[in-house]
């Protein structure tokens, strides 16, 4: 009888301990959680220049990577990146796979239904990119009867669907893939953000084969995406962004990567 009592007591202690751990985790705020972990886990693509991409040494770099580093440093946290296709980043954030997303994410009304966004740290607008010398496209709204390429899950996929009238919509994991198909003649134009298009044309070996047509459409804020009910972490991130806007870092980074300020 005594042995059975000791076994039952041990099991009860384990159960109560587990319940205590769960209760502590459930009562932690988002900021307390990352501070306890000692790191900020960031979801990003790694294939969307100039925001997030691999350099010649296969190391993550870009505008978003610098911002992630600044935020983590200001919060006294280590930094961990998790890469994946853009279409999976917001769902992954909602599922708790990372703490924030920095990957050129437009703060659209649709996305705001499932996640929150920080203050903007860049601006973006959709443009049409065509093969140089191609006729028949005057801008992103001129898509009637056209085959249009777009990055899967991007805000520009939503823009294209909103405008409508296209013959076919092809989706791609990143800008490099969509522009490769454009150059190969498989799409009439690619709908993408102006900063990403300008950077590709400037720095890619095939950039001289394509060009931007028309004016930016439907300008949006680019911001840090964060899970709902993460108010204290969101506030902390906003303070960092505001601080860097005031001390000149914001403008320096914008000029470095885009050749313009926002």
Where does each model-flagged region fall?
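A ligand-binding cleft/hinge motif common to bilobed small-molecule-binding domains
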Residues: 105-113, 159-162, 183, 188-218
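Short helix-initiation/N-cap motifs at beta->coil->alpha
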Residues: 29, 80-91, 135, 154-155, ...
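Extracytoplasmic small-molecule ligand-binding "clamshell" domains
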Residues: 27-103
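Periplasmic-binding protein-like
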Residues: 123-130, 194, 198, 202-242, ...
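Acidic, polar ligand-binding/catalytic clefts
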Residues: 69, 78-141
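C-terminal motif of bacterial Sec signal peptides marking the signal peptidase cleavage site
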Residues: 15-18
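Ligand-binding clefts/hinges and TM-proximal coupling segments of bilobed small-molecule sensing domains
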Residues: 21-26, 157-169, 208-214, 236-262
């Amino acid at each position: 009888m005594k042995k059975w009592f000791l076994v039952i007591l041990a099991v009860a202690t384990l159960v109560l301990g587990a319940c205590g751990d769960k209760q502590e985790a459930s009562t932690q705020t988002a900021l307390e959680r990352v501070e306890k972990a000692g790191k900020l886990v960031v979801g990003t693509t790694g294939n969307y220049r100039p925001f997030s991409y691999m350099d010649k040494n296969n190391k993550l770099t870009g505008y978003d990577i610098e911002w992630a580093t600044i935020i983590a440093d200001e919060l006294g946290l280590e930094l961990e990146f998790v890469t994946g296709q853009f279409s999976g980043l917001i769902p992954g954030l909602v599922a708790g796979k990372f703490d924030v997303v920095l990957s050129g994410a437009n703060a659209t009304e649709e996305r705001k239904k499932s996640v929150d966004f920080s203050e903007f740290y860049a601006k973006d607008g959709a443009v049409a990119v065509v093969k140089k010398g191609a006729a028949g496209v005057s801008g992103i709204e001129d898509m009637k009867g056209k085959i249009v390429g777009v990055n899967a899950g991007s805000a520009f996929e939503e823009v294209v669907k909103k405008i409508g009238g296209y013959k076919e919509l092809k989706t791609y994991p990143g800008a490099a893939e969509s522009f490769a198909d454009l150059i190969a003649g498989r799409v009439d134009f690619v709908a993408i953000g102006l900063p990403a298009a300008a950077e590709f044309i400037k720095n890619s070996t095939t950039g001289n084969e394509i060009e931007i047509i028309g004016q930016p459409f439907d300008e949006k804020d680019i911001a840090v995406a964060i899970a709902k009910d993460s108010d204290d972490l969101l506030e902390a991130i906003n303070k960092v962004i505001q601080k860097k806007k005031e001390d000149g870092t914001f403008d320096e980074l914008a000029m470095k990567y885009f050749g313009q300020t926002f």
